[in-house]
UniProtKB/Swiss-Prot annotation:
Coiled coil: none
Family the entry assigns: Belongs to the Casparian strip membrane proteins (CASP) family.
Keywords linked to the UniProt accession: Cell membrane, Membrane, Transmembrane, Transmembrane helix
Descriptive protein name: CASP-like protein 1D1
UniProt cross-references to InterPro entries, sorted A to Z: CASP/CASPL, CASP_dom, CASPL
Transmembrane segments: 30-50, 81-101, 125-145, 168-188
Biased composition (Basic and acidic residues): 1-13
Cellular component annotations (GO), alphabetically ordered: plasma membrane
All ranges on the Extracellular side of the membrane: 51-80, 146-167
Topology in membrane: Multi-pass membrane protein
Top-rank taxon, per record: Eukaryota
Amino acid sequence: MASTDKPDPEAIKSEVPQPPPPAPLRRDYFAVDVGLRVFLFATTLTAIVVMSTAKQTELAPVPGVPGLRVPVEAKFNHSPAFIYFVAALSVACLYSIITTLASLGVIAKPIYATKFLFYYALWDVLMLGIVAAATGAAGGVAYIGLKGNSHTRWTKICNVYDTFCKHVGSALAISLAASVVLVLLIMLSVCSLYSRVRRAE
C-alpha cells in the first residue's frame, strides 16, 4: 500500500541551500583609500596655488626701438592652457574632498561599500583623464617657453622669466604626482571589487 505521507514543506525549505551572504569588505581598503584621497587633495591644492602665484615682471626690449626696454609681466592667466590647468585641478581638488568624506562614511557604514567602489572606479578614471589632459596641455606650453620653437619663430622666455617658469614647472610636477595618485586609487578600487567577487563565489 502506497504511503500517503506528504513531505513537510518546512523540511524541504531547510534542505534548499541558502545563497552565501555577501562577503564583508575589509575596512583597511577604505583606510588606504582615505589616505590616498587626502594626498590627492594636498597635491591638487598645492599645484593650484603654485600655478596661480606664477607671476613675474621683467624689462623687455621693444622691437624696432633700440635701447628701449619696458616692463612686461608674465602671468599664468596669459595662457589658456594654464587657465585650463587651474580649472581642471580645482575640479579634482573638490572631487577629492567629496570622495574623502564619502569614504569616511563607508568606513562607518560598510553596507554600501561595493556600490561606492564601483562608482569610485568610474569617476576616478574620468578625473584622471581631466588631470592628465590639463597637465599635457600646460606641459606643451611650458616646453615652448623653455626651449622655444625655431620653425614657428616662437622664442623661449624662461631665460628671462626664470621664476615664472620655475612655478610652472613645479606645478606640473605636482600635478603628475596627483595623476599617479589617481592611478593608484583606480587600481585599489578595481582590486577591492575583484577581491570581493572572489570571496562571494
